[in-house]
């Protein structure tokens, strides 16, 4: 089973992703509300996949992505973005993010991105 770390500063967004993924039989390994928590939890939990919000307090998603990829260059991270963040998404993909999903989350788009990244 694929274990996922869900990262977003908005609890309702984490809940939405959790519901979509659990319904599709993914296991939520953990949740983080900022990039610093995300990097720490990644190191502890070693999930198969991370969904990472870009705009967060303490440490944003780009910085957390860098930290995670420094720790584990093979990490699979999907960035979660608002519509008008194309430049930042491009930066994240160039850094090593595997895919992105746009808010508000649509179940099919989330599951398609996860399937692409996980090779299902």
From Swiss-Prot:
<dbReference type="Pfam" id="PF00072">
    <property type="entry name" value="Response_reg"/>
</dbReference>
<protein>
    <recommendedName>
        <fullName>Protein CcdB</fullName>
    </recommendedName>
</protein>
<dbReference type="InterPro" id="IPR011006">
    <property type="entry name" value="CheY-like_superfamily"/>
</dbReference>
<feature type="domain" description="Response regulatory">
    <location>
        <begin position="3"/>
        <end position="118"/>
    </location>
</feature>
<dbReference type="InterPro" id="IPR001789">
    <property type="entry name" value="Sig_transdc_resp-reg_receiver"/>
</dbReference>
<dbReference type="GO" id="GO:0000160">
    <property type="term" value="P:phosphorelay signal transduction system"/>
</dbReference>
<keyword id="KW-0597">Phosphoprotein</keyword>
<dbReference type="InterPro" id="IPR052048">
    <property type="entry name" value="ST_Response_Regulator"/>
</dbReference>
<feature type="modified residue" description="4-aspartylphosphate">
    <location>
        <position position="53"/>
    </location>
</feature>
<keyword id="KW-0902">Two-component regulatory system</keyword>
